[in-house]
Amino acid sequence: MSEVTQGPRSSVFTTMRFSKERGLFLIEHHIARMIEHATQLRIDATAISMDSIVQLLRQNPPEMVEGLLRIEYTHSLQLRISYRPFSIQNEQVDAVTLPSPIWPARIAGTKHGAWDAYIQARQHAEQKGADLALMVHEYSIVDGDRCSPLILDEDGVIWVSDSNTSVDSITFKAIHDWLLDAGFHIQHGRLNERLVARCVEAVAVGSGVGVLKIDSIDGEPIGDGSSRLFDCCNSCLERLYNGSENWDKVWS
């Protein structure tokens, strides 16, 4: 892993699920986002390709059967990889809030090289006995430390942050249409205090966590105790995980 003290244009990265047997999960989506973010960060994305990544992975296979793969591409055109086990998956969690780092428009919303604020936010949450840090800007939740928050209101509308500091979630995009098919409506807007305080349910989705049901924020209970959105996200993810077309083999 790169030094977290690097500047934002030092590298671009992504994190995805891997299975030694099945390969890489939604890798094409991750590569597309890496290229988009690299371009935004003025990093030459020429070497970000399936072939270059697979070659590096085969030279450095994982010791664990499954887990998370972090792929980083530096401004000096180097690919780096690291593996780690899952920490928390598809569980009920408690969250705390922290101020979101604010970057210039060309940096905001990218998975960039100065990711220390998010790493520290996660560590702060764990020190407080919580599982998740939610990043707040102008009294609204804009992101999670490693996942994207979704807020369900009493009218069945799922609210997603429209802030330019929010990182586009590959996981959310993958289940988006299934959520619509399940009868939810989806709206982008501000996840402000009033919306969150009155919500029916709050969850967070991401490659590293699957889906998390947020039961409390800063010690205050959230939602009415129902789990319709959590259950639906869980079901959608299971369908994705079980679809062979969503995996690209690497080691077998």
Features from the language model and the residues they span:
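Helix-start/capping segments and mature chain N-termini
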Residues: 1-58, 74-252
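Short secondary-structure junctions
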Residues: 60-67, 182
